[in-house]
Every structure is written in structure tokens, then in C-alpha cells.
Amino acid sequence: EGDAGTGMVATNSVAKRTGNISAGTSIFAMVVLEKELSKVYPQIDLVTTPDGALVGMVHCNNCTSDINAWVNLFREFGEMYGLTFDMNDLFTKLYSVALKGDPDCGGLLSYCYFSGEHMTGFEEGRPLFVRSPESKFNLANFMRANLYASLEVLKVGMDILLKEEKVAVDEILGHGGLFKTKGVGQSILAAALDTPVSVMETAGEGGAWGIALLASYMNNKAEDEALDDYLDAKVFAGQKGTKMDPDPKDVEGYNAFIERFKKTLPIMKAATETMK
């Protein structure tokens, strides 16, 4: 899994008690473990850092594809009125409005299942948006629900590591497209995992940046210099980034959302069985 190692390097999360999350069209989290897990979990893959430390990985097939589809729908609406958009600006505005939504998304629910998810037992998926007549249906809650949904399956897997296995993580580093809009994906991830999340200036660089750093390490390291020491001293020293602690209200709101998601998974089952 080449992307795993390069993602760890790109976020300087190769030391124990660190973790990183790569979030784009798919999403995966990697946490460097202090010890082996107590048992085998089908939902958790075990990999290693480039220098051999044990890592628990949670991989999910879906993340931002459904959000991208909705943003394109808004673009088409604007174009009917003769408007043209810079897509980065459109994403920024729509992501940012999510921060004005209710912590629990006003009762809205989204499933971003473009494909199946082994984490929740689905071989195929159907993107769905669901609300009740009493739900608070507005743009802020709508965008917030879709951003929450991008992390919903990851949350199920990470709860195994953080809650069942009591894995210690001091900080999660985020990178990938979900984090390009400053403070939005970061704050929602912090709420979902109830863990501090940092995003560096290189957050949008992803695996290619990690590959370059590994090549630099192999070419320029001092004798017996460990990878984490090299990254700390020669790459990320002075690197600007932002750290965000979870907001307790958002944590409570995300927990309400994820319980609603798990309780209503039969909706997804019915959709995959009947919508062929």
C-alpha cells in the first residue's frame, strides 16, 4: 500500500501516538501503534511506517465524491443565470457555510456511498440524502450533513481503535482535498474523532509530496538518522500549520449524527436491493 507510507511522511506522522488522515475521493486513517491490537479486526488493516513501526489503518472507499456531485449541481444552477464560477471559490463558499449549521445537522442525514463499504457490510452503495418532515432543511445544514457523511464510515472504524482498543493518539494530521478550505474539514474531523487535528500548509500535496520527501531522506540523511528525526529536523522544522481542538458541542452533534446513521443503515440496504 504505497499511498499509506507516503501519506505518513507527507504529514510527518511516522512516530508512535501520531496519526494521519488522507481525505479525497476515498479516505483512510493511519495511527502509529505503541503495541499490537488485542485481537484481529476485519475492519482494521495492519501496515507499517516506511521504517517499520506498526500502524493500524482504517480504509473507506467513499469520501468526497458525493459532495463533489452536489457542488456541480449548484454550479449548473448558477450557470442557468449566466454566472461563471471559479470552482475552488465555489467549494470554499459551500464548505464554509457548513460551519453555520446546527451541530447535529438539524436532523438531516446523508450516505456518501458511491460504492460499497466493508466497514458496514455493503458490497455496493447508493448515494442517498434523507430527512424527516421535522428536519431543519437549509443550505448550512445540508452542506454540514454532506461533510459529516464524508467521515461517517471512517468514524465507525476509528471508534474500534480509539474506544475499544484505547489506542492513544496525541494528534491527527489531515491532508488531501477535504482540508483545502481552511478550518472546515479540520473542525469536522476533530469533532468526529474527539481528537485534536492539525493541518499543515502542505495539506493539499498528498502522496507525491511524501514520495519526494522519502527520496530526499534516502539521499541526504546522516548516518543512523531515523526517519522521524530527519523529518522533524530537516523538513518540518518551522513548518506552518494550524491545530484545532474539538468543540464539545460539535462532538455531541457528530455523535448524534453517527448514531442516526448507524440506526438507519437498513435504508441503504433497501436501496441497494431495490434500486438496480
PLM regions and their residue ranges:
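Active-site core segments that coordinate phosphate-bearing ligands/cofactors
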Residues: E1-L173, L178-K276
